[in-house]
């Protein structure tokens, strides 16, 4: 298998990208990499070029650029060239830590949607923080690709999330939940009420009802679906709360005197374990599900471990053939819908 990598994307690129790629190359003997970027910056960083091909690009899409305009104007950028390589069958997947909007636009307009999918969903893997929970993480989509969604989009997100949980996370009959402002069936606006009823009626989904944002990390479902605006706001609120708690704990230790500092020394291993559980480097990147090939974006501040784990995630996606299975499912659904349509004659 071959992965097309945007070597120039991210706050710490290309150094951490190259380091992460080399670590993944050593870990997975069946992966070859095409690194797209500026040879003058990238080549000196490569310690061992085994199964790493450096492909020169002359342009770069910056973090603040307008996404669609950027991919249309900068045809020789590392993001566009990597996406084109996937479209033309020269690579099996596309990975970047760069401009999120540009990656989404390149995935949508260059790699292309699966037939039958109206809108792809940005899919994050989040940790389950509840002690004693059997699962370690869950699938969360759409985490920001679509600010507005229709009922059909959320139903498709549920199916996309199901396939991902089954094939990539190895969850049997994953529990599907709808992010809402209450657990009761009649909660939410018209959209959420209607989606709830339609998810409930889906015979091939293990729908377990609504889940509130306060229970987002509680392990109540293996897949949580939402419109992109709500899901992104809930995710950022959760991240902000976690950061604030860490700040309060740190402040308490620093200003709590000798007793607090001694207590921290005893609890340091526990804090490290929690940091690893909640760390963004642990779970890989966000996948734009609903496209014809894996398009995966990790956060801009990613370190080499995050790059390595994101590539491991892509490796599992390719090995499990989750995209092929998704294509087959939605192709069948579309065929059935066409049969059910009344004839114009």
Curated annotation (Swiss-Prot):
Pfam families in alphabetical order? FA_synthesis (PF02504)
Top-level EC class as recorded in UniProt: transferase
- The answer on whether this UniProt entry bears the keyword Cytoplasm reads yes
User: Can you name one GO molecular function term for this protein?
Assistant: phosphate:acyl-[acyl carrier protein] acyltransferase activity
Q: In which pathway does it act?
A: Lipid metabolism; phospholipid metabolism
Q: Which InterPro entries match?
A: FA_synthesis, Phospholipid_synth_PlsX-like
SUPFAM superfamilies per UniProt: Isocitrate/Isopropylmalate dehydrogenase-like
Tell me its EC number(s), please: 2.3.1.274
Q: What catalytic activity is recorded?
A: a fatty acyl-[ACP] + phosphate = an acyl phosphate + holo-[ACP]
Q: Which family does it belong to?
A: Belongs to the PlsX family.
Q: What does this protein do?
A: Catalyzes the reversible formation of acyl-phosphate (acyl-PO(4)) from acyl-[acyl-carrier-protein] (acyl-ACP). This enzyme utilizes acyl-ACP as fatty acyl donor, but not acyl-CoA.
Subunit and partners: Homodimer. Probably interacts with PlsY.
This protein is called: Phosphate acyltransferase
Origin species: Limosilactobacillus fermentum (strain NBRC 3956 / LMG 18251)
What gene does this protein come from? plsX
